[in-house]
């Protein structure tokens, strides 16, 4: 976020009438805006039925919604609200029978795009969560009960809809794994393939037979290798939650853009809270921006209507930026209108 604050757009005026076109072509689909809802796990902890609300909002506004493997709603239940436009994010399972069944379920439920996550070779320490007292599952202590008591609306909705669960992964938990939420969380973690390799990725691509996106790429060498196998690179540092030493994706975006063919699509996330920041990413070479936290902040504050409220704010911000720099098409946001505080990075963008 601090890095994004040091990127500036220089307005250029007297260009005549500007009616910005925000539409983006991605994998043969035309989306109304250049942003979508990133995959987020255990969304039911934020608000019950969050996946349903976001799926319905995404269809209404013609933007992509990516369902996480470890979401609280299942592949099938969420698909009912996606009208065949959903994306499915896969945490690659070590057990290939589970992997193949997940892909089969997603394909049978008409998910169009597969997003394979690559950036979990080991469990991260996540010191910020530990210091904040956050745990999965939540601890049954006075602090938890206190926070539930002062948020009666959330507590009532949670009691009404049931405690959050792993909607997609629950069915793979045999007798050895049934039991407490802590045990189930352990199962979900144990099933993730720690060290993804190119052969595994090729197998996934062959099985899916549709657009495959590789999420978590942070190095141009990896991007070049991946571009020979899959259909899109997804720059991400896991929302800053996986490796504290990792740079922001916006820092490595220009280098990755230069390393790939001009028409090879790049998606980016991590730290994008506003339409202004999304415009900066597009000007630096991204084709599309995914964001998670803003939508869930909206839902946490306002429930179902919060998702639409956040969408409208971001869309209005992007349109306003394009009008201010007199740009008629989102694909034409010109790089030369950028200026950057060089104390951060990237002196030459051309």
Regions found by a protein language model. Name each.
Residues 1-29, 137-196, 331-333, 339-350:
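An N-cap/entry alpha-helix motif that binds or orients negatively charged groups
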Residues 1-7, 191, 248-269, 273-350:
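Alpha/beta catalytic cores of nucleotide-metabolism and tRNA/nucleoside-modifying enzymes
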Residues 1-121, 314-316, 333-350:
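N-terminal capping/small domains of soluble enzymes
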Residues 20, 41, 125-132, 147-198, ...:
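Glycine/Thr-rich beta-alpha phosphate-binding loop at enzyme active sites
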Residues 35-38, 65-67, 86-90, 114, ...:
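Hydrophobic faces of well-ordered beta-strands that scaffold small-molecule active sites
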Residues 37, 58, 116, 204, ...:
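Conserved, mostly hydrophobic/aromatic
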Residues 46-51, 67-85, 93-105, 121-132, ...:
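Active-site-adjacent beta->alpha loops and helix N-cap segments on the catalytic face
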Residues 69-72, 93, 214-220, 264-278:
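Glycine-rich beta-to-alpha transition loops that act as phosphate-gripper elements at the mouths
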